[in-house]
Amino acid sequence: MDQIVNVDEFQELAKQALPKMYYDFYNGGAEDQHTLNENVQAFRRIMFRPRVLVDVSKIDMSTKILGYPISAPIMIAPTGNHKLAHPEGETATAKAAAACNTIMIVSYMSSCTFEEIASSCNAVRFLQIYVYKRRDITAQVVKRAEKAGFKAIVLTVDVPRLGRREADIKNKMISPQLKNFEGLFSTEVRPSKGSGVQAFASRAFDASFSWKDIEWLRSITELPILVKGILTREDALKAVEAGVDGIIVSNHGGRQLDYSPATITVLEEVVQVVRGRIPVLLDGGVRRGTDVFKALALGAQAVLIGRPIIYGLAAKGEDGVKKVIDMLKNEFEITMALSGCPTIDDITRNHVRTENERLHSML
């Protein structure tokens, strides 16, 4: 594993290790996959404005999210069905997160039970949820999360219906039975045609859930609530007005509405309307420590990593996940040093130049 030096190399190992159906499930996006690809490419169009002759002999990457300290502004995004990638599933991912002193957001669609994940190691964890048509099931899950020591709820708001993921349709992707819902309802779908995941989502997800229903979620938990799936200033303002405790700028990894903007391109408009009242996080397309720096320079408090975690898990289990996080942290630390930023607070908007700024400078 010492020979692996970047996320792309882990992706290739994951492709070799996983059955095609599972690799396509994790790696694919919606329809033309424009948004999926643009998430990554948009970071590459942002350039640095490094400052020199700054004392960077000591670099401090640490920060806090909702008051919880983490070693670097790199968290684990919610992704489902980790046992499709590795037999230990989310418990391996959780142990790696704990070892790296970061926060894991556990998916509602996890293979392991929330209690198994919580008992696997001592760490800060948030729980991502969808709201099902049967609200009682969502309420039960939230109460279980509270009892298991989860510290926040992350409400995904961009899935009234599942995006059209053509690889899953072609592969007849199964929807496995999830242990968290045994005795409540069946999550298993093995389709004769089409995507089982899409069939399950159509049956289970509540497409009527709206901003006014945030009050319902608040009524059943005292945990902080973050909303994941914000892409516009209008919805960012609605989130603040609804009293949520944080925003995650996300397009669901390019898996929902194709031709949605890359998350890094809309981060600033969200940050500007939020005005520091609540934390703003970002996911989508982060593959390098340089990407982490760019997101922070444009106003994010931290980034979430999704697919790279799965690549590490599929390739090398817990150790693979740790390696992915450690690589990104190392790259981020070097970027801070070379940009003249000894601490997170030293990273400013003046350290980057976006594509629009470059184009305007040419006029």
Curated annotation (Swiss-Prot):
Family that this chain belongs to: Belongs to the FMN-dependent alpha-hydroxy acid dehydrogenase family.
Entry annotation: catalytic residues: 252
Documented EC number(s): 1.1.3.15
Species: Arabidopsis thaliana
GO cellular component terms given for this protein: peroxisome
Residues the entry annotates as binding FMN: 78-80, 107, 128-130, 156, 228, 250, 283-287, 306-307
Role of this protein: Oxidase that catalyzes the oxidation of a broad range of 2-hydroxyacids to the corresponding 2-oxoacids, with a reduction of O2 to H2O2. Displays the highest activity with leucic acid (2-hydroxy-4-methylpentanoate) and has intermediate activity with 2-hydroxyhexanoate and 2-hydroxyoctanote. Shows lower activity with 2-hydroxydodecanoate, valic acid, and isoleucic acid and extremely low activity with glycolate and L-lactate. Cannot use 2-hydroxyhexadecanoate or D-lactate as substrates.
Principal EC category: oxidoreductase
Assembly description: Homotetramer.
Disulfide bond residue pairs: none
Residue ranges the record marks as coiled coil: none
Presence of the UniProt keyword Lipoprotein in the record: no
GO biological process entries: defense response to bacterium; hydrogen peroxide biosynthetic process
Any matching Pfam family: FMN_dh
Protein name: Peroxisomal (S)-2-hydroxyacid oxidase GLO3
Protein localization: Peroxisome
Catalytic activity: a (2S)-2-hydroxycarboxylate + O2 = a 2-oxocarboxylate + H2O2; 2-hydroxy-4-methylpentanoate + O2 = 4-methyl-2-oxopentanoate + H2O2; 2-hydroxyhexanoate + O2 = 2-oxohexanoate + H2O2; 2-hydroxyoctanoate + O2 = 2-oxooctanoate + H2O2
Entry's Gene Ontology molecular function annotations: (S)-2-hydroxy-acid oxidase activity; FMN binding
Record domain FMN hydroxy acid dehydrogenase: where: 1-357
InterPro entries for this protein: Aldolase_TIM, Alpha-hydoxy_acid_DH_FMN, FMN-dep_DH, FMN_HAD, FMN_hydac_DH_AS
Keywords, ordered alphabetically: Flavoprotein, FMN, Oxidoreductase, Peroxisome
Motif Microbody targeting signal positions after renumbering to this chain: 361-363
Keyword Flavoprotein: yes
Record-linked SUPFAM superfamilies: FMN-linked oxidoreductases
Cofactor(s) needed by this chain: FMN
